[in-house]
Every structure is written in C-alpha cells, then in structure tokens.
Amino acid sequence: MKKQVKWLTSVSMSVGIALGAALPVWASPDTSVNNKLNFSTDTVYQIVTDRFVDGNSANNPTGAAFSSDHSNLKLYFGGDWQGITNKINDGYLTGMGITALWISQPVENITAVINYSGVNNTAYHGYWPRDFKKTNAAFGSFTDFSNLIAAAHSHNIKVVMDFAPNHTNPASSTDPSFAENGALYNNGTLLGKYSNDTAGLFHHNGGTDFSTTESGIYKNLYDLADINQNNNTIDSYLKESIQLWLNLGVDGIRFDAVKHMPQGWQKSYVSSIYSSANPVFTFGEWFLGPDEMTQDNINFANQSGMHLLDFAFAQEIREVFRDKSETMTDLNSVISSTGSSYNYINNMVTFIDNHDMDRFQQAGASTRPTEQALAVTLTSRGVPAIYYGTEQYMTGNGDPNNRGMMTGFDTNKTAYKVIKALAPLRKSNPALAYGSTTQRWVNSDVYVYERKFGSNVALVAVNRSSTTAYPISGALTALPNGTYTDVLGGLLNGNSITVNGGTVSNFTLAAGGTAVWQYTTTESSPIIGNVGPTMGKPGNTITIDGRGFGTTKNKVTFGTTAVTGANIVSWEDTEIKVKVPNVAAGNTAVTVTNAAGTTSAAFNNFNVLTADQVTVRFKVNNATTALGQNVYLTGNVAELGNWTAANAIGPMYNQVEASYPTWYFDVSVPANTALQFKFIKVNGSTVTWEGGNNHTFTSPSSGVATVTVDWQN
C-alpha cells in the first residue's frame, strides 16, 4: 500500500530565464566530472554493455555462446567497451547531455553455455561472475577498460560500474558438473566451488522463496551460488577486488541485489570504500513492486551508507504515464511520501525502466508518455538514470526482450531532444539537483510542481491527457516577476508564462503538453545541497556541495564542533572538502559558516562512525519469546544503538543460519573495539531487557567474526 505522507517544503534551484535552448554546463566544482561523491547534478545512462555497440569484433565469443544474427537474446551479441568508447567520441552521448554511464559488471564471467528449458544461455548480462579481479574478455581487456574511462573523463562523463558481490554463477546442489559449479577465482587461482565447499565460501541453505528478508539474504537467488560474506577469505577478497576497479578510475558503483545481502556487511563494505584513497558514490538495487514500500527498504536507504534505486518513483511513473492505472494526484503523494521517508532523497536514483522491467515504450503506442515520463524524471528530485534505447523508443516486455541490441542512434528523436534540453539544466540550475519539491497545481491529469534551492527555481507543468487541454489558474510560484519561455522550446506543446507577485497568470496547458520554466541567480548566503558520502569516520574527507559558500575559507560545524584551518581541505563557492572531526559517533548535523559569518541551514543525519568498520555476527541462544515479541541487540557504541531500545539493532533472525530459539544478526561495528552488549525482547512499546552482566567481545581489527552467547534471565 502506498504511503500518503504529505510534505510541502521550499525547494532551491539555480537557473536563468529560459530561452528554449540547451543550457551550457557550469564549470563549478560541484558539477565537475571530478566530483565522485555527488551525482545529483548528473544524468546517468545505463548500458547493457553487450547490447550497445560492437566496437571490436575480435573479442566476440565464438561457437554456441554467440548469436551473430541476434536471434537468441540469451547469447552474446558483441557489444563491448570499445563500442561504448566510440559512441562517447562521436558525440552521441555528450550531445544528449549524458554526464555518467552505468555499465554492466565488468568482471570475468563464466564462459559455459547453459541450456535452460531448451534455450542456450550465457553470461552476456555480466551477472554470472567467477573472477572479480579479471575482465570479461567479451567486453575487452584492462587496457580497453582504461581507455573507456579516459575517453569518458575527457568528455566530462563519469563511469559507474555494476557490481554483484551477492553471488557467483549457477550451480546445482546435486550435480557438481552443472555449468561451472559456482566457481570463484582470485586472479586466476581457484578459491573454491559450490560443491565440496570446505572453506565455507558459500551459503548452502537452498533457494529463497522470497517470503522473508532473511530467506532472501541467506538462501540462493534462483540457482546462483550465494556468497557467504561472513567469511574472512570472502570479505578480504571482495574488498581487494573493488579497490582494483576503483584504482582504474571508476567514479561510482551500483550494487546488485542489496536486498539479498546482510545490511551489516554492506555497511562495513561501503565504509571501507569511503575510507579508501578513491571514495565514490554508491547505490544499490532493492526491487519494489508497484505500490510497494517496506520499512526494511527505508532503513537500508537511511542507515547503510549506500543509496538506492528509487523503485517507488519508477513504479509510480509507470502506473501514471504508461499504464494510466494511477493519477497525477497519486504521483504527487509518492513524491511527498518518499521525501518524508528517505533521509537522502536527492541521492535516490530515479528511472522509468531498466533491464529487469518491461520497456517503458509499448509497441504501437504513442511516444508522448515516454517523453513526458523522461521530462518528469529529469526535473524531479534524485539522480535520473535513462536506460539505453529509451531515447530511441525501444520496446520489449520482460527478460530478455527488454535487452535487445541498440536499434539506432537517431539524434532527431523527440525523446533524445527532451533529454538534450533538460539534462544540462541539472548542471546549470541547482534547484533540480538539490531543491525540495512543492506541488503548485494538480488534478488527475495535470501536475504542476516547483523545485527551489535558495532563490533558484524551476517550475514544471505536465498534462498527460492526449485529448483534453486544461486551464491553469491561481498557480503560485517562487519565480520572480517576468515572462518565462519553455526550456523545451515547445517540443512537447509547452508555452510561455508570465509571473506577477508570486502568481502565474492564467494559461492553458495543451493536451499532452509539458513545459519547464526556470530562473537562476547567485547566492550570497550558504546553502548546503548535498553531503557525500553521508557517513564516515573521523579523519575521512567528505564533500559538501551547494551554493553561496564564498571563496574565503571559514568553518564547517559538525554538531557543536567547528572545523577550521588545515582540516578544511578545500573551499570554493559551490564545494567544500572537509575532514570529519573527532566527535561523538552517530547522526549529527552539518552546517557551513561563510566568511561573512552567515551560517547555513543544517544538513541533518550525517552518520559519524566510531572508527573503521568490521562485521560481527551476534548470536544468542535460548532466547524464547512470546507471540509478537522479537529480539533486538543494543550496546555501548553508536553502531549498537548506545544502549537505547529505540536505536537497537534488529529484529534479529532465527530461521536460516540458526533456528529458534537461537537468534542472529550481522552488524557493522568499529574495529578492534571492546564491545559491551545485551539483547532485548520487543513487542510494540514493551521492552524486556536481558538480565545479568553485559556481554563483552573485542571486535577484530579487520575482517569478520562471530560471537555467541546465551540469553541471561
């Protein structure tokens, strides 16, 4: 059921009066290709590498693994990194305003061809890995990958790599000869296989039925060999592997299947990335169906240190524009409720289709819904991601039909032009990157919303009806007095508007009409737009983006602790790099005070970590519970809730890796730290504390560990 929490907050954005032409990319630090920790100003283009362009036929697989005529969509088609590089260099992507590419997982996958139900299948998609320290030869060599990174950066494009540490490749619990038996290699040396797994590299709990979060984490996803992250060999191997790719210049990581890995391990994992020499933006895939929102999903987005693909937004956009099963009022409700639920809404990655969904464009249908959905996504909060071929109106329902070969590169398609007009606006107007959202006019077919950041504003109007024009009257706005031209130049039947005294003069929004009007100005007072990453230990360098910081260094305050001098690494009007001070761990507010002594509003919920993080599995035996009770964990550090029931860790699990009345949970805790902890039983507002003395355990200096105790009455 959709949450209906209302939120009407002022939004800040920066843009000049629109003239209907594409706006130049601002050369400010926050919008730079070098800003690897904030993607709010970017427009991402998702590519299934094998399905984009074959730039080097010499690396194509041979024999049964390759479909030269593209007739079997489960086989390789030949797309590679050279092909992507070619499309960067020929201007197709830059011409569309794309500033980040999200490519298929680049690591070595199995080469076996697997027959499922009479159809040959391959690892063309990149999700059947076997060696995270080598490249997929069908995509190219390390040299090819480095060339792709270099070409992208030279064209002001970031590169995000897909990464799937949840699993290796298909395996059978009864047939070791099936495929490659889940084999995992370390730069060519076999670490182990799913069968005869004496090292405990994998979970052996059968396949998940998706009935519980626990089942999804500790059981196999379909027939994929599920990696056991609570294993020191695995933990160190995966950390080494991601550093290899970061050292090659990757700018961001999209984690596959985050719903199916322990949140505690993932928090410790991304914290190691943020503490490395090459910290980058991270986001993960937690699939949600239409009208679905779960507390586990919200908790992950708010507490893991990683951001998420915004499935709630995507599903609603599809229902409103593609399927017409919901209204613009419903869309406004989702914008409001997600803005209230997610602490870091501007970091959620928005989209309208991807490799796991039916293509947005339907065969034989009007293209206007696709164009309007793109316009809304590009002007809404979050980081917009466009699936390859959507701008060419590619169609296809379900896997693999939604992963066809790129059909063409026509720059005259209306959808391409919509992206071309609006993507640069995210760079030039901070209202789109950082601003909040206010509904200005809404009915079942029309949505008028405003983004605002300081005095920067963008106003967007969309009419999804293909037959009815609507008179718009009484719409309020923060736009200054004046006449504003549609940024889209009438491409989607938009019009100009006049603003007087905070009200838009009455106008008619055409059937199928979409318009964007905007205003930009400089800010004299500091306004924080984003902080990246959103968690870090003392000593880590974080990036603060926004406007009005000035060019003279002053101070950044964490809670009540001011940071000045050399601990401010750099200070520019739109971006500050600062070291996290030695303050109490936990969520804290961050403010910026400029040289004039003006202090910004706070960026809340920056999560200060106690120290470097490791993963510990906490297990408690004989914790019997009454109906409605669950077991939670709390202890003496912020990562364990600081002895408060409200911040306790859990609810713990008791079905897969251990069985009731034993409960367990994998938790990210500070390394090499003397921990004290207890378990509590919770039923609503009723909390029952464990008796006896505090349990004690010293966490390891690195890796993972397990501590097992008995419940104390």
Curated annotation (Swiss-Prot):
Its main location: secreted. It is an enzyme of class 2 (transferase). Ca(2+) 1 binds at D54, N56, N59, N60, G78, D80. Keywords: Calcium, Glycosyltransferase, Metal-binding, Secreted, Signal, Transferase. Residues 166-229 are annotated as: B. CDD domains: AmyAc_AmyMalt_CGTase_like, IPT_CGTD. Residues 610-713 are annotated as: E. Residues 230-434 are annotated as: A2. It catalyses: Cyclizes part of a (1->4)-alpha-D-glucan chain by formation of a (1->4)-alpha-D-glucosidic bond. Residues 526-606 form the IPT/TIG domain. The keyword Transferase applies. Ca(2+) 2 binds at N166, I217, D226, H260. The active site is at D256 (nucleophile), E285 (proton donor). The record marks D356 as: Transition state stabilizer. Residues 28-165 are annotated as: A1. GO terms for biological process: carbohydrate metabolic process. Residues 435-522 are annotated as: C. Residues 608-713 form the CBM20 domain. Residues 523-609 are annotated as: D. Binds 2 calcium ions per subunit. GO terms for molecular function: alpha-amylase activity; cyclomaltodextrin glucanotransferase activity; metal ion binding; starch binding. Belongs to the glycosyl hydrolase 13 family. Monomer. May consist of two protein domains: the one in the N-terminal side cleaves the alpha-1,4-glucosidic bond in starch, and the other in the C-terminal side catalyzes other activities, including the reconstitution of an alpha-1,4-glucosidic linkage for cyclizing the maltooligosaccharide produced. This is Cyclomaltodextrin glucanotransferase. It comes from Paenibacillus macerans (Bacillus macerans). The lineage of its organism: Bacteria, Bacillati, Bacillota, Bacilli, Bacillales.
